[in-house]
Amino acid sequence: MKPENKLPVLDLISAEMKTVVNTLQPDLPPWPATGTIAEQRQYYTLERRFWNVGAPEMATRAYRVPTKYGQVKTRIFYPQPDRPATLFYLHGGGFILGNLDTHDRIMRLLASYSQCTVIGIDYTLSPEARFPQAIEEIVAACCYFHQQAEDYQINMSRIGFAGDSAGAMLALASALWLRDKQIDCGKVAGVLLWYGLYGLRDSVTRRLLGGVWDGLTQQDLQMYEEAYLSNDADRESPYYCLFNNDLTREVPPCFIAGAEFDPLLDDSRLLYQTLAAHQQPCEFKLYSGMLHAFLHYSRMMKTADDALRDGARFFSDRLQQD
């Protein structure tokens, strides 16, 4: 697609999204476009500090949990003494960026709105870790907390997975991994997915959308994929191209959130249509005027806060139905 044939996205986004795009952090250096991944990670963490200010205070604990790849950092958020369930959160960042600090506010708000314990898992980033290491680390962390639930004062009888962008793929992939390999870590009551990628190689939205404003050009997406996967065959794995998995049975209830001007929107639409066609419990919600990654901006945008509340409500409703 020639760039001039793409939609003029920055002219079409909502007023509140434009406010975020135009927000300048005066002490922030330019994005290191030609820098190393380490430099980009450092910048991303610095840039996200502004957006994590003002999150709800609650009891928080940090722990390292064992996996076959070594110890993985986790952060547990306890919003209240009563804990109806535990949500595992997987951060986005194209598999190569992000950590527990860059998504701290998101996790705190999700814990506050759901009133469930939230555990963030700091899975090893790519390219240091190649598929399926991140999924195996997530599953190992779930198993560990299931076995040690009493020690950590958490309820692991009912669990959920949640994530944004690449983290959304990891969330659903982990839930399917548990199902397929018959691993008991508690009943998966729901999966919360914000603007994820689920395996499409091409789509209408990937052609019409994506640019320097969201880091999701076709070249960007190819770079993330090459960093994450071990080899070409992994592209068809049912835990990377989730449409190659069996989505006709025993898929946990899914809340699927899409952003109107996200190149990955068609991934979310296809996931919803597939699940709905096979009577798998799911809900799709489109957030008008939004760019990819809008969930970060709840400090300034009501729509971002609404999207977190919507996911929390979906999960709470599923708990009530059990």
Swiss-Prot record:
Catalytic residue list: S165, D262, H292
Compartments where located: Cytoplasm
Quaternary structure, from the entry: Homodimer. Interacts with MalT and MelA.
Known EC number: 3.1.1.-
Motif window: Involved in the stabilization of the negatively charged intermediate by the formation of the oxyanion hole: 91-93
Protein family according to the UniProt entry: Belongs to the 'GDXG' lipolytic enzyme family.
Function: Displays esterase activity towards short chain fatty esters (acyl chain length of up to 8 carbons). Able to hydrolyze triacetylglycerol (triacetin) and tributyrylglycerol (tributyrin), but not trioleylglycerol (triolein) or cholesterol oleate. Negatively regulates MalT activity by antagonizing maltotriose binding. Inhibits MelA galactosidase activity.
Protein name, entry field: Acetyl esterase
Matching InterPro entries: AB_hydrolase_3 (IPR013094), AB_hydrolase_fold (IPR029058), Acetyl_esterase (IPR023508), GDXG_lipolytic_enzyme (IPR050300), Lipase_GDXG_HIS_AS (IPR002168), Lipase_GDXG_put_SER_AS (IPR033140)
Top-level enzyme category: hydrolase
Organism: Escherichia coli O6:K15:H31 (strain 536 / UPEC)
Record keywords, A-Z: Cytoplasm, Hydrolase, Serine esterase
GO function term, MF aspect, one: carboxylic ester hydrolase activity
Database matches in PROSITE patterns: LIPASE_GDXG_HIS, LIPASE_GDXG_SER
Highest taxon, organism lineage: Bacteria
Keyword Cytoplasm attributed: yes
GO cellular component, one term: cytoplasm
